[in-house]
From Swiss-Prot:
Organism the protein comes from: Illicium oligandrum
Protein name: Ribulose bisphosphate carboxylase large chain
GO MF terms held by the record: magnesium ion binding; monooxygenase activity; ribulose-bisphosphate carboxylase activity
Gene3D superfamilies listed in its UniProt record: Ribulose bisphosphate carboxylase, large subunit, C-terminal domain (3.20.20.110), RuBisCO large subunit, N-terminal domain (3.30.70.150)
Active site positions, chain numbering: 175, 294
Top-level division of the source organism's lineage: Eukaryota
Additional comment: The basic functional RuBisCO is composed of a large chain homodimer in a 'head-to-tail' conformation. In form I RuBisCO this homodimer is arranged in a barrel-like tetramer with the small subunits forming a tetrameric 'cap' on each end of the 'barrel'.
Function as written in the Swiss-Prot or TrEMBL entry: RuBisCO catalyzes two reactions: the carboxylation of D-ribulose 1,5-bisphosphate, the primary event in carbon dioxide fixation, as well as the oxidative fragmentation of the pentose substrate in the photorespiration process. Both reactions occur simultaneously and in competition at the same active site.
Post-translational modification: The disulfide bond which can form in the large chain dimeric partners within the hexadecamer appears to be associated with oxidative stress and protein turnover.
Transmembrane residue ranges: none
Gene responsible for this protein: rbcL
Note on how the cofactor is bound: Binds 1 Mg(2+) ion per subunit.
Assembly behavior: Heterohexadecamer of 8 large chains and 8 small chains; disulfide-linked. The disulfide link is formed within the large subunit homodimers.
Modification sites for N-acetylproline: 3
Length: 475
């Protein structure tokens, strides 16, 4: 046993309080392949050494409590305790550190994101010895990730279901988000799908309100999907939001969607909760439904640089819990997303193996083994002039979603959809011909607009629209 650590079983029980670092700070520890590793941004209270702060995080998120207890002698703390094994200062920040913590795999229930988060971030964030605490990243070992189903279907299976290859998928959120009747809502869905979109979407707060009950919305949207499919010869879908007040009601809505024969449903995974989300993901795999995930409430958790949890952790958790799409920012639109950081967690969503890369905020090498990938969804304040940048940034395996950028077209919903489809096809063709979309993107759009009056009108409406604010989420 290391001389720098001690357990109550080895030294005998002595009542009282002692420093966490005596037991939970273990700089000589060599991490195991089966450990869950965490990187915390720690801001200690004045006078608290970083080693004590890091050890406190390890203790309070695993086996520790505020005082010694005699029942510690009934177990093996060296087997079950979290360990702060490395601390490094944050460059350019005063009294701020990255504390690396290793957790033994046996601390966590198999297949439960809920249990994992309850342990790692459930209680320690209110600890008085810390001014602020942020979970920056997690390394999920294959021994744990293999206990999860993951996404219901994944990227390749979705493409096969939709018979759509070689380009990003195109979507639209129906607006106004609240207040439409079910029939008028279905009309907007039909017009957008008929104009060339692959998907339309319920907004995250469309559930089952007095102005539009869920069953009515589902029926009219299904009618719109089938009509648009018959007229275009393409497979279409609408993200029917199954989020509800109870898990039982959520599954009932998903069952009805399956009975209607539609291809995809939707869930607000943070407000709905990980237990509900995992249940829905299992139902979707068993019944052939794709699952679109909205991240409503994420900025409450991830936007502050010094406290909370980075979205890359929420993205990893979603891949484990299950979802085929998830909103991931745009880099260029109205919602938060710095390019390198955004592409870092986009790769964590899509790829099988991601190398450690601190320049993109990736603290650990992550091996997902054979877990299916998740399509990132770019949505929020984007329009046709953004299409070249979005195509270049996100690549083919993505969903580009234009709400106001479709329904705000001066000629109506269907022309708005036409404009976006023409712009996307032009950008994909230009890229495939070897043109540089980052440099020539505007010219590509101008050339395409000569052959599409719908695109020309969209270009005129949105030529001056920009969202130029400094990103909060930077390295």
């Amino acid at each position: 046993m290391s001389p720098k650590t001690e357990t109550k079983a080895s030294v005998g029980f002595k009542a009282g309080v002692k420093d966490y670092r005596l037991t939970y700070y273990t700089p000589e520890y060599e991490t195991k392949e089966t450990d869950i590793l965490a990187a915390f941004r720690v801001t200690p209270q004045p006078g608290v050494p970083p080693e004590e702060a890091g050890a406190a995080v390890a203790a309070e998120s695993s086996t520790g409590t505020w005082t010694t207890v005699w029942t510690d002698g009934l177990t093996s703390l060296d087997r079950y305790k979290g360990r702060c094994y490395h601390i490094e200062p944050v460059a350019g920040e005063e009294n701020q550190y990255i504390a690396y913590v290793a957790y033994p795999l046996d601390l966590f229930e198999e297949g439960s994101v809920t249990n994992m988060f309850t342990s790692i971030v459930g209680n320690v964030f209110g600890f008085k010895a810390l001014r602020a605490l942020r979970l920056e990243d997690l390394r999920i070992p294959p021994a744990y990730s293999k206990t999860f189903q993951g996404p219901p279907h994944g990227i390749q299976v979705e493409r096969d279901k939709l018979n759509k290859y070689g380009r990003p998928l195109l979507g639209c959120t129906i607006k106004p988000k609240l207040g439409l009747s079910a029939k008028n809502y279905g009309r907007a869905v039909y017009e957008c799908l008929r104009g060339g979109l692959d998907f339309t979407k319920d907004d995250e707060n469309v559930n089952s309100q007095p102005f539009m009950r869920w069953r009515d919305r589902f029926v009219f949207c299904a009618e719109a999907i089938y009509k648009a499919q018959a007229e275009t010869g393409e497979i279409k879908g609408h993200y029917l939001n199954a989020t509800a007040g109870t898990c039982e009601e959520m599954i009932k809505r998903a069952v009805f969607a399956r009975e209607l024969g539609v291809p995809i449903v939707m869930h607000d995974y943070l407000t709905g909760g990980f237990t509900a989300n995992t249940s829905l993901a299992h139902y979707c795999r068993d019944n052939g439904l794709l699952l679109h995930i909205h991240r409503a409430m994420h900025a409450v958790i991830d936007r502050q640089r010094n406290h909370g949890m980075h979205f890359r952790v929420l993205a990893k958790a979603l891949r484990m819990s299950g979802g085929d799409h998830i909103h991931a920012g745009t880099v260029v639109g109205k919602l938060e997303g710095e390019r390198d950081v955004t592409l870092g967690f986009v790769d964590l969503l899509r790829d099988d193996f991601i190398e450690k890369d601190r320049s993109r905020g990736i603290y650990f090498t992550q091996d997902w083994v054979s877990m299916p990938g998740v399509l990132p969804v770019a949505s929020g304040g984007i329009h046709v002039w953004h299409m070249p940048a979005l195509t270049e940034i996100f690549g083919d395996d993505s969903v580009l979603q234009f709400g106001g950028g479709t329904l705000g077209h001066p000629w109506g919903n269907a022309p708005g959809a036409v404009a976006n489809r023409v712009a996307l096809e032009a950008c994909v063709q230009a890229r495939n011909e070897g043109r540089d979309l980052a440099r020539e993107g505007n010219e590509v759009i101008r050339e395409a607009s000569k052959w599409s009056p719908e695109l020309a009108a969209a270009c005129e409406v949105w030529r001056e629209i920009k969202f130029e604010f400094e990103a909060m989420d930077v390295l």
